[in-house]
């Protein structure tokens, strides 16, 4: 099992190519390239902050 270094991340063998971020979680991308992202992604319910961490959406504004 692969591990991720950043708190709130989980390793995936086939994650979305359009992960949610603080910039797009209110209006998620509608058209993502097909395929799988292999690597560490934020766990469900968390989004990627511009500082690289995984946060709950209300924390995007801090």
Swiss-Prot record:
It is found in: Secreted. It comes from the Eukaryota. One of its GO terms (molecular function) is serine-type endopeptidase inhibitor activity. CDD domains: TIL. Pfam families: TIL. Expressed by the venom gland. Keywords: Disulfide bond, Protease inhibitor, Secreted, Serine protease inhibitor. GO terms for cellular component: extracellular region. Residues 4-60 form the TIL domain. Disulfide bonds join 4-40, 14-36, 18-32, 22-60, 42-54. Belongs to the serine protease inhibitor-like (TIL domain-containing) family. Serine protease inhibitor. This is Venom peptide SjAPI-2.
């Amino acid at each position: 099992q692969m591990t991720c270094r950043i708190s709130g991340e989980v390793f995936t063998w086939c994650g979305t190519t359009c992960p949610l971020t603080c910039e797009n979680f209110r209006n998620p991308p509608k058209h993502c390239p097909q395929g799988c992202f292999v690597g560490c992604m934020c766990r469900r319910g968390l989004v990627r902050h511009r500082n690289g961490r995984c946060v709950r959406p209300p924390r995007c504004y801090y």
